[in-house]
Amino acid sequence: MAKIKLGIAPIAWTNDDMPDLGKENTFEQCVSEMALAGFTGCEVGGSYPKDPVVLKKALELRGISIASAWFSSFLLTQPYEQVEKDFIAHCEFLKAMGAEFCNVAEQGNSVQGKLDVPVFAGKPTNTEEQW
C-alpha cells in the first residue's frame, strides 16, 4: 500500500496576494498549527524564512517538509533571461529544501493582487503573438 502524505498551503493562514488577510499570523504560528492539524507537508509562503538552513530547522522541529512552492513567471512582460534566472534560483531553493515539485503560473499582465482592477471588466487579453 502506498504511503500518502498530506500537505497544505499557508494561504489558509496568510494571504500573499492580499497581505492584510492573516497578517497577524506569524510563520511560526502557521507551521505549528499545520503540524498540530496533522499535516506533514506544505507549500512555501511569503512569510517563510528565505534561508534554507533556517527554514529546514523550523520545519523539522515540527515534522513538516516542503512539498512545493509557487513561482510566478512573467514571460509576457519581462525578458526571458531574467525569468529563466529567477526560475533556476527558485528551483535551487526547492531542491535545497528537498521538494520535488514547483507550481508555475504565468502572471504577466495578471490582475492578481491589483485590487483596483475589476476581475472581468479589467482583465487583459493576450495577442496572437503572446499566445
Q: Locations of the language-model features?
A:
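Short glycine-enriched loops at secondary-structure junctions
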Residues: 105-110
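Conserved anion-binding
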Residues: 98, 111-113
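Active-site gating loops and adjacent loop-to-helix segments of metal-dependent hydrolytic enzymes
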Residues: 113-126
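N-terminal pre-domain/capping segments
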Residues: 1-101, 123-130
